Amino acid sequence: MKNPISISYLRNKFLEGIITRLCKYLPASDIGRLFERVQIDFAGEDPRIGAYALEYNNPQALCFLIDAYPTLRRLFNEYPRMSDIRLIDIGPAFGAAGGLLAQMHRSHFLGPKLRVDALDIVADRKNFIEMSYPMISFLHSRIEDISPDKTWDIAYCSNVIEHLDNPQNFLRLLLERIHGYAVLLAPYMEEKPLSLDHKVRINEATFEGFPIISFEKLTTPAWPPTADGVARQQALIVLRGTARSKV
């Protein structure tokens, strides 16, 4: 016997039909502006959160991704062209980086197809991310609460570890869930006083004892000089995952 169609499913399909039909009566530009207003509403009760996401956080996240993409691309090329890569974006903020990766690699046109998960401890990001980037699956969890049996091929982690009291413990837990590589960005040797919510300075010593593939320093518009004119750099690090291969 087939499972009965739920009332919520029928309701959602009915509403989708109404919204789609109504949108046909609006100019395309009005629909775009309406979508941005809905994004802001979904980002949190305070509209300033959504405005911050669209005007500042997402542009910064995309700029960091542009900096890291050549490295990610080289790693993607190690996989068969027609394969699927499981990628997790950890600490995705409002999802712009993972969303763009999912859109770019939604098929095998550019090589391996990506299946993107986004993991964050902030539950309020879920609605904004899943509405803005529907190809992403959002996971509300800490890395230590993810089953060791749940693994990914590649991790992308931009400007997260400097917010942690113990980044080494986080890195160990992360690598145990990654078969391929972890690509990380973080402020390099940030001058004191550290930026808001930053807890540690990141340098080469942070990664001692870990399987480092590469460590480079870069300058990026996403991490500009301070108000006092002090130049700042980002570190771009690639680590090898330590997850056990599935038999």
Task: Give the ranges of each region predicted by the language model.
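A short acidic, helix-capping loop that chelates divalent metal ions and anchors anionic groups
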Residues: E190-S195
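Conserved beta-strand signature within the Rossmann-like core of class I S-adenosyl-L-methionine
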Residues: H179-M189
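Conserved acidic residues
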Residues: I85, D153, G180
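A short, conserved alpha-helix within the catalytic core of class I
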Residues: L164-L174
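A short SAM/SAH-binding and catalytic strip from SAM-dependent methyltransferases
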Residues: I154-D165
